[in-house]
Amino acid sequence: WNIVFLDGDWYYIDPTWGDASYQREEGEETPTLTETVNYDYFCVTTQEIERTHSMDDNQLLPVCSAVQDQYYRHEGLYLQSADKEKIDEIFARAAQKGAPMVCFQCADDTVYQEVYRLLIEEQGIFAYLPESETTAAYLDSDRERTFYFWFTEVS
């Protein structure tokens, strides 16, 4: 991973953990490019990176504590609460852009669990499906408190 100085603050970026762009389909010799990029490790704090990465004790590194350029916050994809209006806004912006995927991060475990209950357990995600015949798939990470949703038209 890397440490970068951005807009006057230090951040961690791990592009290798976020690169889901190359996948091999069975029988393919070359990887294919997908449209999914994982932003969980883009401009994160020391506290966030230490949940999944181990640092060498012999390296003197700056403390990364700024959050304003963390991907989800910077892009308005960060939920401070399980606010239905904010969730509606995130899905509406993605639909307006024609994005095949919606992703966002929750501020803490309580918000993550409440959003999980609303969208997954209570099946609230289906309210965001387009009117055409569409299926939804999702990936969530309780460790990173993130959700990724994909919508695919049924052929």
Predicted ranges, named:
Residues 40-155:
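N-terminal accessory/pre-domain segments preceding catalytic cores
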Residues 1-43:
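Hydrophobic/aromatic-rich core segments of domains that either
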